[in-house]
Amino acid sequence: MEAPAAEPPVRGCGPQPAPAPAPAPERKKSHRAPSPARPKDVAGWSLAKGRRGPGPGSAVACSAAFSSRPDKKGRAVAPGARGAGVRVAGVRTGVRAKGRPRSGAGPRPPPPPPSLTDSSSEVSDCASEEARLLGLELALSSDAESAAGGPAGVRTGQPAQPAPSAQQPPRPPASPDEPSVAASSVGSSRLPLSASLAFSDLTEEMLDCGPSGLVRELEELRSENDYLKDEIEELRAEMLEMRDVYMEEDVYQLQELRQQLDQASKTCRILQYRLRKAERRSLRAAQTGQVDGELIRGLEQDVKVSKDISMRLHKELEVVEKKRARLEEENEELRQRLIETELAKQVLQTELERPREHSLKKRGTRSLGKADKKTLVQEDSADLKCQLHFAKEESALMCKKLTKLAKENDSMKEELLKYRSLYGDLDSALSAEELADAPHSRETELKVHLKLVEEEANLLSRRIVELEVENRGLRAEMDDMKDHGGGCGGPEARLAFSALGGGECGESLAELRRHLQFVEEEAELLRRSSAELEDQNKLLLNELAKFRSEHELDVALSEDSCSVLSEPSQEELAAAKLQIGELSGKVKKLQYENRVLLSNLQRCDLASCQSTRPMLETDAEAGDSAQCVPAPLGETHESHAVRLCRAREAEVLPGLREQAALVSKAIDVLVADANGFTAGLRLCLDNECADFRLHEAPDNSEGPRDTKLIHAILVRLSVLQQELNAFTRKADAVLGCSVKEQQESFSSLPPLGSQGLSKEILLAKDLGSDFQPPDFRDLPEWEPRIREAFRTGDLDSKPDPSRSFRPYRAEDNDSYASEIKELQLVLAEAHDSLRGLQEQLSQERQLRKEEADNFNQKMVQLKEDQQRALLRREFELQSLSLQRRLEQKFWSQEKNMLVQESQQFKHNFLLLFMKLRWFLKRWRQGKVLPSEGDDFLEVNSMKELYLLMEEEEINAQHSDNKACTGDSWTQNTPNEYIKTLADMKVTLKELCWLLRDERRGLTELQQQFAKAKATWETERAELKGHTSQMELKTGKGAGERAGPDWKAALQREREEQQHLLAESYSAVMELTRQLQISERNWSQEKLQLVERLQGEKQQVEQQVKELQNRLSQLQKAADPWVLKHSELEKQDNSWKETRSEKIHDKEAVSEVELGGNGLKRTKSVSSMSEFESLLDCSPYLAGGDARGKKLPNNPAFGFVSSEPGDPEKDTKEKPGLSSRDCNHLGALACQDPPGRQMQRSYTAPDKTGIRVYYSPPVARRLGVPVVHDKEGKIIIEPGFLFTTAKPKESAEADGLAESSYGRWLCNFSRQRLDGGSAGSPSAAGPGFPAALHDFEMSGNMSDDMKEITNCVRQAMRSGSLERKVKSTSSQTVGLASVGTQTIRTVSVGLQTDPPRSSLHGKAWSPRSSSLVSVRSKQISSSLDKVHSRIERPCCSPKYGSPKLQRRSVSKLDSSKDRSLWNLHQGKQNGSAWARSTTTRDSPVLRNINDGLSSLFSVVEHSGSTESVWKLGMSETRAKPEPPKYGIVQEFFRNVCGRAPSPTSSAGEEGTKKPEPLSPASYHQPEGVARILNKKAAKLGSSEEVRLTMLPQVGKDGVLRDGDGAVVLPNEDAVCDCSTQSLTSCFARSSRSAIRHSPSKCRLHPSESSWGGEERALPPSE
């Protein structure tokens, strides 16, 4: 168990078996408690175990946590703690510890291993058990500790503290046997535990003295037992308090949940009330038939509100669920801790039993007097066991309470699940995807929607029923109207009213027709509205089917996953199905009632109109069809009468025709006699005599009855007339014929039957096609009835013809009544048969309707199922599309992040790669990185890295591709990064090789140093012995005469010599290292040049083949006799071009080889014609198209790279030579003035007698000067002589400079040493070894060069070295006097350095320039001291040894930066410029005795040179820049007319407007120019100031930086070489701090963009 965090750490004293883990933080959830039984994160939950350690030593020490009995003051902790919240046990323990400091207890024991018990009430068990066992431990461990001397950590290691009694002063323990009582706490009122233990050890020794010791010890043990009981009670109270607090918090949470549940039920009741209200509204709307838009909108708003409320409830439920999960985690954690405490208890029990057994063994050997003590101990242990038993009982009670709480927790979980299943599990914080996929949320939504749709469907079904009832009522009214119309418009009425005239009848018919039309229109409108309602109902049923299918599928899906949720949903589904079944039953019941009402209505119609239309059915009887119009019936009756007349005329004899006429006349008379009854007839028609029966007795003499009877008779008489005609015809046939005639009469009955039945057929047609088969099926049953009726009519109507011939009289009324009765009987029989037929028809119709209803219900159910499936599928598609959209959004975000990370990684990788290359290049060139302490590979640390990035070829390609096409950029990026990876691998391999070489060199150096040190030690020992012998020989007096001054001088001189030796040795090491670097670079360049030679050979061969092919084609194509001369000229020219190109390739290869390796080779040119041929075949001069075209691919155009590469790769990698820039240059070349075109002169002045020393390798080693030909192409001049004053920082130049000058210096010092003459150090320019080459006679020198070199060496050996020259360095100054049209003088001299004051206004410090290389910075610190010593007089030949001076000179001259060592010079009167220019007609070696004042001079007469010399001086002062052209090339540019004389003449430079920048100046990216502009000291002067000041700045007009260094004023840090004169180009650049580095010159773009080491560092601001 972890100790409380609040207890002070002073308590640790005993040995600690294992480090205890960090105690859990003491914190309490402000809103809720984790669990009532197992609180989370309480540091001191099982308090008893935290205070004892497992070992026997620490058991005593750590049990002292119980020993200190608290004061009452210290006991009263934080009175507001109970009100503030849960009082954490660990905090309480800490407060107690502060109130009463405990004894020096041991450290907290480690957490014991977990036991496997799960009871949460073991805490009190542990506490009480420990309290009992502690008392036992006190007695048992006393002997062990007294025998073993006690634990060392407890007794001997404790500082002295006051004893509990505090009377005597504290004292340290005297011996290990006497334990320290000072470990007890000061504030304790009783003896603490550790003190009592120690005291028991003391009293054990004194047991033999008497029983008083036993009594005292017994009292101590009892007091300890009482204290431990109090402690256990306190712990028990704390535990109860903690449990109550947690129980209270859980009760509060339960109340809160119940309140939330009540709130939710309240909202549900409100929603139910609103739902009922909406149902009532919808019912009202269904009854009125109006669709209320406001109501629908209100319902939608209510649905939205309910949805929001349900979402909020879901969110709250989710919060509750999270809390429950957190509680589960806390419970689990507390279970684990309980297991750990159980294990700790077991371990402590074993640890307690060990000392008990040990003490029992010891006490067995003791005296019998100790047996009483053992009994006391056993009694105490029995007491402790009782207490332990009580604690176990309490723990059992706690276990029961815990199980009860667990059950409550489970029940709460079940309630939560029910709540969630009822109200869904929707959380607004969920994403849309989870929202779509959450089963609970969809289920609840669908339930709500399903209820709404079901309610709406119920309302609509009710509305449909109401509409059907209303529709049937309207149809009944319409049928009545049609009946009235049919009664008026039938043939019987026409027959009845034909005698009255048709005026009134026509008007009433028209009115009835209009009314019928109006009723039909209204019926059509009703049909449309019912169709619309049916469509709406179908749509709603579709929606309901969709939701039902969705709901059923959800239930089916959720049955597998969550069966708890699917049960209530299944119950709801079953309830919904039952409700639907009840509704369908109600609908069927209503339909049945509707049918019953229809049948009653039909019967009523039949009864009312029986007398009117016996053979016809009313439209109401015909069913619900509104299309049944009875108008065609009258027309069929009329046609039937016509047909009957025609048949009678054709068939009956004239007698029979007369009888028929008589009968018809009689009927007409009867109708005519009924004139008085018309008003009654109308009244009958208006009153709709529905209750009249024909078979009633006609004796009633009442008016209405008579009128009805007469009306019925008159209506039926017309029908009877036709039937009597046919009957008399058949009766005459029967009476007047034999059996054969009877058969004929019977055969003529079928037409009669058909005639009678034609009405039935017409009726069947009117009834509709649905009931045709049963109508025709009953036809055979009718025939015998009709025959019987006719037979009876035949018998009774025999006397009719005799009576009908008589006129009507009043006395014949009785006979009429008897006839009418007979007719009524006949009609009654017909009506009975008609009723039977109607009953059969109604039964058939009802059966058909039931079948149709069943079929419709099945169809509706199928449609509902289909709509459900469709809705389900639509929901699934929507959820899938939503999920897909979310996934697409997520993946697009991931993709964007990945793209950004990959771009950042590529960017960083590219920067790292460039940094590695930069570092590798500088290492190869021998430059040391600045030791700034930072990691040089750190990407963001150096600002120059972005400059490197802009130079890098990949960035250039990026910009080109972005400018040209974006598609190519996206396609080429993977290839570029693959290429970058490959380059990175190569660079790392090279770095590994270099590191390996460096390691090997380091080991060799260490070996050399070890050997040298050993030899030096031996020499030193020998010299010491020698000096001691010499001192003994010379004796003491000589030593005294020497004095201390001599020794001090010797000491100083020795120190200086040691210092100089170390510096010279470091310089020698640097030179050897650079020599190795240059040799390695040369070997790489050799391979590169061999590859280039092969490539150029292949190109030349290919061009030769192309030219031969062209020539052969031209020869074949052209006419030989017309174009012979031009052909010959073309052939001659092409062959001349190929020849010159071959010569040029050979020369170029040799030049590059010699230039790359730095071999000092000079070539004699015998004549000007030979030199001209060399110039002709040069690819860098104008005159060859092929040369101009091949230029961008020519590797010689770029800088000499230290890494091998083919020309194609160079053109791809170097941004200086991209195709876009070449096009740009070609476009800008059109703006060149025509004066820039080079004119070729084939007349070289061979008679001048000038000896030309041609040295091509310098052109490639020291930065190729660039001019432009007439086409704007960049060309590089090959003709350089030795004096090229441009301090290139390329690796080859540095290596060659150091190595060649080092060799020359060694030879020169050796010669001086042999000569023995000590001269002042006058040497050639230290930065100029490339111009000097070797002063040895190399084998490949020409005779002239050997002669000149010999002269120089003689001069150096001569007495010129005797001169005391205070200037320690000299310079080569190349000077060209430029005339406008005359021949010019070119003078090159190696002269001593003029005084600094003559060129600059003030002297400048050696460290003023920051534009030096990094390597020279490191060397400068050591060599500054050397120079300061050299300036002292002791370094002159009078005071110092020549060896010292030689070493200092070699150290000085080996530095790379010439400007460093042009330090504070002595005041020297006279100018080197004056010496070199006053005697212009001097011979070649006139000033050779002045100390290399002129290496050689090429002199010619000129008329205007003085002003040019002055101009050259001023330009040199103002802007010292390296030469643009070589000496030979300058000479032939000016003499032979090759140069653009107007633009490059220096005489006109000051007055004319300066030329625009060369096209190559636009080649670099603008970003590089801006960065260079920022880094170049942010100079104040603009381009115009620079251009105007160049020819005119004098001594004081030179711009200087803070240290006095001359700073070139510029805008873009780019010099325009085309505007410089030759004199300024030949000036010494090292006089200026800003040298003409390739980064300043736009004419060397490839060097400035790639040479990271060649870029000058920014000047110090």
Swiss-Prot record:
Could you tell me the Gene Ontology terms of the biological process aspect for this record?
Answer: cell division; chromosome segregation; insulin receptor signaling pathway; negative regulation of gluconeogenesis; regulation of autophagy
The known PTMs are summarized as: Proteolytically cleaved in primary hepatocytes into a C-terminal 80 kDa form. Proteolytically cleaved into a C-terminal SOGA 25 kDa form that is detected in plasma. Phosphorylated during mitosis in a CDK1-dependent manner.
Q: What is its main location?
A: cytoplasm
- Keyword Phosphoprotein attributed: yes
Specify where the region named Required for association with Golgi apparatus membrane lies, as residue ranges: 211-240
Q: Which residues carry this modification: Phosphoserine?
A: S1169, S1255
Induction info reads:
Up-regulated in the plasma by adiponectin in healthy fasting female.
Q: Site annotated as Cleavage: where? A: G926, K927
Matching InterPro entries, A to Z?
A: MTCL1-3 (IPR049885), SOGA1/2-like_CC (IPR027882), SOGA_CC (IPR027881)
Question: Under what name is this protein listed?
Answer: Microtubule cross-linking factor 2
Taxonomic lineage: Eukaryota, Metazoa, Chordata, Craniata, Vertebrata
